[in-house]
């Protein structure tokens, strides 16, 4: 069975004010003395990893003197968005990492603020979504997951590191819809970022996990989980 779903969100940095108080230089010279990353989710998730990886890359390249990080969970990213907008004047050197749900949830009225109140600075990564199960799970394929869902819809819980209506939830629902099942019937369990969601999968709390491919591939290579589906048009060589 083939599932041809959309690609996972491209993660972008967002900043309320673009004045960093330092001149922009070129040719490998330092651009900023320091930069602060506001992360709208918990530790170990995709936003967290992207922010810390970006900060490390900027400092290692000598473009930024130092990078600091702050996790601010709540409201599916809404707490951090509201904080950055409402405190823009005191956050000139702050970047917030986010992804497609910032647009989706703004358009659906979930956030009291609008993504247009922020300035998108850059796209940093693109990632596929992946459906993942534990190494000892009897589920070995997407067909197995669909069969388990058919047999016990409420007992086949799918977790994710985003709130209901977020990207992980949407991907799980799209999988079931593509298989001709009721997308609204998915029992989705949200966790505060991908790290906690993965821990729930490893402990057997959920039957499957909807997450970013990059968040699962290392554990899959280590034999701790099985990637049973990826939202790419073609097979991914890292998870054939």
Where in the sequence are the language-model features?
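Hydrophobic residues within well-ordered alpha-helices
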Residues: 84-85, 172, 201-202, 220-223
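C-terminal lobe and pocket-closing loops
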Residues: 215-240
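N-terminal (or domain-start) structured segment
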Residues: 26-117, 181-208
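N-terminal export leaders
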Residues: 6-11
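A structural signal for short loop-to-beta-strand junctions that line the ligand-binding cleft
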Residues: 93-95, 112-130, 157-159, 227
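A bilobed periplasmic-binding-protein/Venus flytrap-type ligand-binding module shared by bacterial periplasmic
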Residues: 38-42, 128-138
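Flexible hinge/capping segments at coil-to-helix
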Residues: 134-154
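N-terminal signal peptide c-region/cleavage motif recognized by signal peptidases
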Residues: 19-23
């Amino acid at each position: 069975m083939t599932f041809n779903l959309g690609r996972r969100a491209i993660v972008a940095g967002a900043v309320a004010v673009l004045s960093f108080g330092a001149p922009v230089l070129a040719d490998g010279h330092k651009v900023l003395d320091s930069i602060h990353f506001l992360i709208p989710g918990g530790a170990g998730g995709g936003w967290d990893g992207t922010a810390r990886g970006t900060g490390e890359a900027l400092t290692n390249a000598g473009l930024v003197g130092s990078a600091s990080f702050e996790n601010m969970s709540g409201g599916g990213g809404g707490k951090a968005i509201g904080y950055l907008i409402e405190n823009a004047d005191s956050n000139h050197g702050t970047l917030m990492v986010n992804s497609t749900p910032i647009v989706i949830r703004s358009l659906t009225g979930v956030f009291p603020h609008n993504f247009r109140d922020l300035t998108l600075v850059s796209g940093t990564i693109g990632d596929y979504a992946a459906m993942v199960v534990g190494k000892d799970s009897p589920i070995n394929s997407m067909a197995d997951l669909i069969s388990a869902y058919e047999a016990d819809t409420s007992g086949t819980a799918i977790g994710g590191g985003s709130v209901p209506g977020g990207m992980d939830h949407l991907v799980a629902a799209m999988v079931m819809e593509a298989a001709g099942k009721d997308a609204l019937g998915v029992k989705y369990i949200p966790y505060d970022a991908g790290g906690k969601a993965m821990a729930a999968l490893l402990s057997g709390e959920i039957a499957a996990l909807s997450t970013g491919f990059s968040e699962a591939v290392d554990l899959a290579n280590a034999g701790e989980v099985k990637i049973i589906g990826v939202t790419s048009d073609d097979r991914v060589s890292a998870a054939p």
